[in-house]
């Protein structure tokens, strides 16, 4: 049994945790906000990393001010040793990790490919937290891919890292339901919290020798590539439900957008019409405005209709549908186009 420090901003609380010290040092690799709950969970469980590795500080926001990644900031608040590394493939960096003699590496959304020597440096190997139920949605954007595909259930997986992309043996998994109106950003926060608990359970199981690894079925794997700006383009031939799923998936970035009267337009808020299929939408070409009221109804594939309740022109503030329609004198029969 050991003492562990749980630290919030401005306060420090000491608690006793019912878990023996890990067999050796833990090295934590992580960069974005998604990785912070896991770092906090490790500290709360008496598994504070001996070293936290994160990517270098970079310019962020409109002002392009240089800022340390969320993991680096939180690790500093927790009093942990932090190392910001531009390239983990560097032999000098790997030498420093080997010299530490780690028991295990924990990797959460770090953002770089690990060479085999780094993966194998810890005695117990390298454990990754992935935000999907592997082998589904391997890749850089599993949360967005699950929401965009209309999945009802996703989850988090811990796996032993190998040279293949998210292809290592599965250690533990935890399912999470996706809310009907939940955005990727909202789901990400829930999965991050669940993932922190799963990492702790995984390390406890590895230390106790109670985890049975199982190989992934590669034939069932799907891929979730990194999001790009072009993913925001609306394909009006899709059903309104599919478009709404993409709207939820691409919040806050890259969003959802099309063109109206030749100028780009961002969809700020929308919902599928109920009932899904309507006579006016069935008779109209996808992308055609069929209703203008408190929501702008746009015909979509399969006779469905998307109700847009807020829109935004570039460089202007968002407007509710009625205000926007009045200002642009928008009437039924107008047409949204795809961004070219």
Task: Describe the residue ranges of each PLM region.
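N-terminal beta-loop-helix "entrance" segment that forms/cooperates
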Residues: 58-76
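An anion-binding loop in the catalytic cleft
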Residues: 24, 231, 237-340
């Amino acid at each position: 049994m050991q003492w562990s420090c749980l630290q919030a901003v401005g306060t420090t609380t000491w608690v006793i945790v019912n878990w023996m010290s890990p067999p050796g040092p833990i090295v934590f690799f992580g960069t974005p906000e998604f990785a912070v709950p896991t770092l906090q969970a490790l500290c709360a469980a008496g598994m504070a990393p001996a070293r936290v590795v994160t990517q270098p500080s970079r310019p962020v926001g409109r002002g392009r001010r240089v800022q340390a990644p969320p993991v680096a900031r939180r690790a500093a608040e927790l009093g942990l040793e932090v190392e910001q590394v531009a390239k983990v493939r560097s032999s000098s960096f790997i030498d420093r990790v080997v010299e530490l003699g780690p028991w295990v590496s924990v990797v959460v959304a770090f953002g770089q490919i690990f060479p085999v020597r780094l993966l194998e440096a810890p005695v117990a190997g390298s454990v990754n937290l992935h935000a999907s139920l592997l082998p589904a949605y391997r890749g850089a954007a599993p949360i967005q891919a699950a929401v965009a595909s209309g999945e009802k259930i996703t989850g988090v997986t811990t796996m032993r890292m190998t040279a293949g992309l998210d292809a290592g043996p599965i250690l533990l998994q935890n399912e999470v339901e996706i809310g009907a109106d939940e955005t990727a950003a909202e789901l990400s926060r829930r999965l991050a919290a669940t993932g922190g608990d799963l990492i702790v359970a995984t390390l406890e199981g590895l230390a106790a020798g109670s985890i049975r690894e199982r190989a992934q079925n590669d034939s069932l794997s799907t891929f979730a590539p990194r999001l790009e700006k072009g993913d925001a383009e609306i394909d009006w031939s899709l059903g309104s439900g599919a478009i709404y799923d993409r709207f939820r998936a691409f919040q806050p970035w890259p969003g959802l957008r099309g063109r109206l009267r030749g100028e780009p337009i961002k969809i700020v808020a929308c919902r599928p019409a109920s009932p899904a299929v309507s006579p006016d939408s069935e008779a109209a070409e996808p992308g055609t405005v069929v209703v203008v009221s408190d929501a702008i109804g746009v015909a979509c594939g399969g006779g469905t209709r998307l109700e847009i309740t807020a829109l935004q022109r570039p460089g202007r503030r968002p407007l509710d549908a009625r205000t926007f329609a009045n200002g642009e004198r928008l009437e039924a029969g107008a047409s949204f186009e795809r961004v070219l």
